């Protein structure tokens, strides 16, 4: 039983609607538009909203959307056929009204489609009932049951051809009998060895006697060979030679410890005084108060663009004429066959740029659904049309549904006289502590005091690393510059303690001391480690931070999808709250090491629908950027 079926234009006008079990289809359809159609996630033609499953089909030629909704616990096999039949009949019946392409004509048009829809629904339900469910074949009806048991027995290590030959030989031996040549050939080795095998004085030997004689024959036969081999091995044994002296190379140097020891003899291994730290080296270059946009372009790209324009300028009028004719051919409606080769190249290009394989397939499928049936422009080709649609989809994906403005949220928390809490999580070695220090420097440059909570009580050296960052940040922002106020401080309780308890104490300490922001550093953990994921979910549930940031590196491909999906799933499964807290944003690190392979940004944003808040581009405190969607897409589409 269907809950609803609705037909509406891409402009938002509902042309016709069928209400089944559901009272209203407004909520589910609005969720479909908001989460799928506007976000360019049309690779899969189904969408789940609460207890409903929605299936939809796009008509790009007439800018229509067909949506059917039913309970997700039901398995309705006729839905795909029904939506295709309704799409075909509705388009053919009301082609004139739809082709006018004006909102007024659509509003004034009468789309009496109720009887036709009920007829199509009845036919689809009857066709699904006619199809009898397939039953499993019984063993008696299978081919294996007709074979004899002996033919299915195979000897280990025996090939099928050898087995067939052995069976033929055994059959031939049975036909010839014991008086044939086979019996005489078997008796020959017995005469040579002098050990009678057959009957003796009219009496047959017992089994024990036969086994004993065969054992003696085996020992006599193989014992002599072993003696010969031992004698030959003794005679052929080479004489021991003296050890060869090692070769002394002309420029090989010396391996003596005294020669290789360059340490000062007076210090005796004692640590020297630490040299004064270079503030400019620590701070980096560039303004730290305002985040700059990420720039993925380079001089090489400009040179390549200039070089590519030179040969095009040298083309004659003949090439321009052929190009014009090629463009004129493009004015037609697109089909999947036309786009298939172009989409295959686009998919391979995205995978080569580090986009996860599954997401690349879904993106290309979404573009195909978006363009199928659409009429191209007069001077456009299939390649340019598909490429432009893919670029628009990628930009739409990178533009977040919810913008994270930390400075505004911190000011709002100040008005309520409480600290703004940010929790960093992620797998091992992605740069959580380093980028936490970069964000601390950015907040200090904007005049906010920061308390760093060392909740990584597992990794050796984690507290010392944060202590070093705190010392250097204090050198950049000493209390003398801020009226004697301590701008950055480390809160730590050592190793082996409960991370959730340390975070709770740090937040209470920040509230009492008047700190503006608390940055919580957590231990790196793999997404499959259930105990550590439970501890992270406990930390987030108990302390309810204002922002949960997932730190991921830009080097990963398919692993990014697995990490984010399992982190979100683990936080939801191990949370004790009624509405579990999930990841709010992403920090993308090591972006300076990937050149133009920026596909991880697409993978992470597509799988979570969460924004990339910060991008790490280096080792100094100023190497922090905000994401520029158009620059990332331009780098991604660069050949």
Swiss-Prot record:
Residues 305-315 have a biased composition (Polar residues). Residues 420-637 are annotated as: NG domain. It comes from the Eukaryota. Residues 137-146, 153-165, 204-240 have a biased composition (Basic and acidic residues). One of its GO terms (cellular component) is signal recognition particle receptor complex. The modification Phosphothreonine is found at residues 285, 579. Transmembrane segments: none annotated. Signal peptide: none annotated. Its main location: endoplasmic reticulum. GTP binds at residues 426-433, 521-525, 589-592. Residues 132-317 are annotated as: Disordered. Keywords: Endoplasmic reticulum, GTP-binding, Membrane, Nucleotide-binding, Phosphoprotein, Receptor. Component of the SRP (signal recognition particle) receptor. Ensures, in conjunction with the signal recognition particle, the correct targeting of the nascent secretory proteins to the endoplasmic reticulum membrane system. Forms a guanosine 5'-triphosphate (GTP)-dependent complex with the SRP subunit SRP54. SRP receptor compaction and GTPase rearrangement drive SRP-mediated cotranslational protein translocation into the ER. The NG domain, also named G domain, is a special guanosine triphosphatase (GTPase) domain, which forms a guanosine 5'-triphosphate (GTP)-dependent complex with a homologous NG domain in the signal recognition particle (SRP) complex subunit SRP54. The two NG domains undergo cooperative rearrangements upon their assembly, which culminate in the reciprocal activation of the GTPase activity of one another. GTPase induced rearrangement of SR drives SRP-mediated cotranslational protein translocation into the ER. Heterodimer with SRPRB. Interacts with the signal recognition particle (SRP) complex subunit SRP54. This is Signal recognition particle receptor subunit alpha.
């Amino acid at each position: 039983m269907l809950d609803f079926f609705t037909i509406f234009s891409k402009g938002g006008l509902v042309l016709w609607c069928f209400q089944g079990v559901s009272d209203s289809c407004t909520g589910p359809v609005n969720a479909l538009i908001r989460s799928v159609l506007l976000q360019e996630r049309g690779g899969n033609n189904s969408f789940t909203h609460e207890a409903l499953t929605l299936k939809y089909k796009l008509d790009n030629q007439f800018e229509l959307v067909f949506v059917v909704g039913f309970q997700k616990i039901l398995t309705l096999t006729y839905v795909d056929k029904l939506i295709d039949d309704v799409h075909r009949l509705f388009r053919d019946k009301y082609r004139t009204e739809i082709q006018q392409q004006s909102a007024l004509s659509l509003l004034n048009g009468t789309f009496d489609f109720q009887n036709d829809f009920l007829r199509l629904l009845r036919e689809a339900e009857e066709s699904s009932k006619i199809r009898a469910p397939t039953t499993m074949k019984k063993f008696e009806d299978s081919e294996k049951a007709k074979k004899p048991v002996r033919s299915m027995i195979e000897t280990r290590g025996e090939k099928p051809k050898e087995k067939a030959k052995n069976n033929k030989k055994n059959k031939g031996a049975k036909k010839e009998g014991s008086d044939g040549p086979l019996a005489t050939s078997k008796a020959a080795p017995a005469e040579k060895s002098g050990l009678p095998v057959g009957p003796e004085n009219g009496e047959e030997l017992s089994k024990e006697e036969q086994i004993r004689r065969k054992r003696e024959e085996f020992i006599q036969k193989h014992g002599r060979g072993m003696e010969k081999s031992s004698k030959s091995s003794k005679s052929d044994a080479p004489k021991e030679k003296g050890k060869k002296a090692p070769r002394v190379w002309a420029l090989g140097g010396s391996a003596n410890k005294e020669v290789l020891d360059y340490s000062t003899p007076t210090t005796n291994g004692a640590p020297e005084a630490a040299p004064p730290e270079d503030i400019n080296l620590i701070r980096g270059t560039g303004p730290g108060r305002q985040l700059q946009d990420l720039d993925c372009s380079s001089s090489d790209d400009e040179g390549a663009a200039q070089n590519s324009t030179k040969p095009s300028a040298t083309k004659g009028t003949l090439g321009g004429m052929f190009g014009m004719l090629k463009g004129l051919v493009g004015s037609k409606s697109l089909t999947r066959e036309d786009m298939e080769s172009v989409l295959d190249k686009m998919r391979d290009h995205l995978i080569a740029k580090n986009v996860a394989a599954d997401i690349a397939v879904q993106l290309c499928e979404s573009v195909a659904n978006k363009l199928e049936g659409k009429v191209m422009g007069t001077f456009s080709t299939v390649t340019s049309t598909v490429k432009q649609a893919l670029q628009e989809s990628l930009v739409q994906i990178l533009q977040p549904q919810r913008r994270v403005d930390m400075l505004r949220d911190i000011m709002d928390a100040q008005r309520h006289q409480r600290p703004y809490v940010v929790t960093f999580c992620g797998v091992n070695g992605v740069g959580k502590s380093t980028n936490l220090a970069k964000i601390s420097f950015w907040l200090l440059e904007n005049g906010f005091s920061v308390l760093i909570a060392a909740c990584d009580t597992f990794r050796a050296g984690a507290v010392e690393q944060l202590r070093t960052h705190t010392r250097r940040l204090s050198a950049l922002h000493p209390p003398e510059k801020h009226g004697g106020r301590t701008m950055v401080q480390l809160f730590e309780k050592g190793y082996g303690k409960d991370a959730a308890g340390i975070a709770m104490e740090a937040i209470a300490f920040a509230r009492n001391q008047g700190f503006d922001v608390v940055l919580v550093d957590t231990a790196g953990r793999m997404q499959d480690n259930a105990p550590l994921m439970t501890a992270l979910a406990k930390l987030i549930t108990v302390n309810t931070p204002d922002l949960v940031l997932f730190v991921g590196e830009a080097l990963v491909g398919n692993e990014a999808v697995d990490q984010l999906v399992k982190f979100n799933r683990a936080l939801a499964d191990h949370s004790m709250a009624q509405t579990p807290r999930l990841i709010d944003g992403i920090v993308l690190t090591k972006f300076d090491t990937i050149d133009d392979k920026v596909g991880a940004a697409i993978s992470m944003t597509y799988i979570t629908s969460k924004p990339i808040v910060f991008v790490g581009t280096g080792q100094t405190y100023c190497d922090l950027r905000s994401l520029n969607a158009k620059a990332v897409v331009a780098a991604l589409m660069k050949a």
